[in-house]
């Protein structure tokens, strides 16, 4: 550990969803191991309030909400709330005196990024999605360094493509995918986020029943809160309860990825990057209400590489999944090739590349 006088400091702004928080935590842990002091800026009512302290980092909160797509009164009040949040963020910056401020998405990134530039602190932005969010789109005009996970995300500013930081434990899984070619029963992991995905809960029981008529298949299905009993009952009604493991939430995604031969899931930025890193083929059903339909653009990275199939939600039913899963179950060599193609597009050193951008700016002083 460097002594206190020389210790570099970073203020990280990331919150709201796992797609923002988990990549930021990967960078925070890396920099902390390099002797950096890390502090976080977020909002008190989102997941970062719980997760960040659990990982050993101090966090400050801003009183800020999203303004996109909300009512007129909130939009009218937004400039005043944003100004107040900028002042709150500036107070944190003056107290902590970071060498670098990094924004990775979430409500706090906007006012925190503005406060950083007003304070003369270098600002690094990282955009996880293939289409930038509104905050990063605006801040990219004033940021010192702009990073993105996917090529051609920003069209009007210079940005470096560095991938999405993910946990090193998942990267280590990527070299062990040959089992998909050898095992008899196709192992299908179904995940729809912490709330589950209704479309998967509706169609997967019928899909398992249909595929099982010609090919052995087992399912690990994450159904989301308050859906466990109803989805379990549907599998049981179709006589498939012996071939499925149903859970509200999967805490150990490392174990789930290690178990799976193929994944049925949404195409959030972090999910797409994790699938690439672990070398898993997938059936991707983008969330149809995502802002700017960014999940469809995220999915294209794997689809164009031949590592995934894109299934628009309006076209998804049990018969569509039966067709795709039966095809994969009957052609294990192609299934393995899809996994290899996924691994080929992975950016395995994304955490280090994002961290290095921060280190480089700090060294410039």
UniProtKB/Swiss-Prot annotation:
InterPro entries: GlcNAc_MurG, Glyco_trans_28_C, GlycoTrans_28_N. It is an enzyme of class 2 (transferase). SUPFAM superfamilies: UDP-Glycosyltransferase/glycogen phosphorylase. Its main location: membrane. UDP-N-acetyl-alpha-D-glucosamine binds at residues 17-19, 129, 167, 194, 250, 269-274, 295. GO terms for cellular component: plasma membrane. Its EC number is 2.4.1.227. Keywords: Cell cycle, Cell division, Cell inner membrane, Cell membrane, Cell shape, Cell wall biogenesis/degradation, Glycosyltransferase, Membrane, Peptidoglycan synthesis, Transferase. It is found in: Cell inner membrane. GO terms for molecular function: UDP-N-acetyl-D-glucosamine:N-acetylmuramoyl-L-alanyl-D-glutamyl-meso-2,6-diaminopimelyl-D-alanyl-D-alanine-diphosphoundecaprenol 4-beta-N-acetylglucosaminlytransferase activity; undecaprenyldiphospho-muramoylpentapeptide beta-N-acetylglucosaminyltransferase activity. This is UDP-N-acetylglucosamine--N-acetylmuramyl-(pentapeptide) pyrophosphoryl-undecaprenol N-acetylglucosamine transferase. It comes from Shewanella piezotolerans (strain WP3 / JCM 13877).
């Amino acid at each position: 550990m460097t002594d206190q006088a020389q210790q570099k400091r970073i203020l990280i702004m990331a919150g709201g969803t796992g797609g923002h928080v988990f990549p930021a935590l990967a960078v925070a842990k890396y920099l902390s191991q390099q002797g950096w002091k890390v502090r976080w800026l977020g909002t008190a009512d989102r997941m970062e309030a719980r997760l960040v302290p659990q990982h050993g980092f101090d966090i400050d909160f801003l009183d800020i909400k999203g303004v996109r797509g909300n009512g007129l009164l909130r939009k009218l009040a937004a400039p005043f709330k944003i100004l107040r949040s900028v002042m709150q963020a500036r107070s944190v910056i003056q107290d902590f005196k970071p060498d670098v401020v990094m924004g990775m998405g979430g409500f706090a990134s906007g006012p925190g990024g503005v406060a950083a530039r007003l304070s003369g602190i270098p600002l690094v932005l990282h955009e996880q999605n293939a289409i930038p969010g509104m905050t990063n789109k605006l801040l990219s005009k004033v940021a010192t360094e702009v990073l993105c996970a996917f090529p051609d995300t920003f069209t009007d500013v210079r940005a470096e493509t560095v991938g999405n930081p993910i946990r090193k434990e998942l990267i280590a899984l990527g070299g062990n995918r040959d089992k998909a070619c050898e095992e008899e029963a196709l192992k299908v992991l179904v995940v729809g986020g912490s709330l589950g995905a209704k479309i998967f809960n509706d169609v997967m029981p019928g899909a398992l029943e249909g595929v099982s008529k010609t090919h052995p298949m087992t399912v690990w299905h994450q159904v989301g809160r308050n859906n466990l009993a109803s989805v379990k009952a549907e599998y049981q009604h179709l006589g498939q309860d012996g071939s499925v493991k149903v859970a509200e939430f999967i805490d150990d995604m490392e174990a789930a990825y290690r178990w799976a031969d193929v994944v049925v899931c949404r195409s959030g930025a972090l999910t797409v990057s994790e699938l690439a890193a672990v070398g898993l083929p997938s059936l991707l059903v983008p969330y149809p209400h995502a802002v700017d339909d960014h999940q469809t653009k995220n999915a294209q990275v794997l689809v164009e590489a031949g590592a995934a199939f894109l299934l628009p939600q309006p076209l998804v039913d049990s018969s569509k999944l039966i067709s795709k899963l039966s095809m994969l179950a009957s052609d294990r060599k192609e299934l393995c090739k899809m996994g290899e193609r996924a691994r080929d597009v992975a950016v395995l050193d994304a955490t280090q590349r994002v961290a290095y951008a921060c280190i480089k700016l700090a060294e410039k002083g």
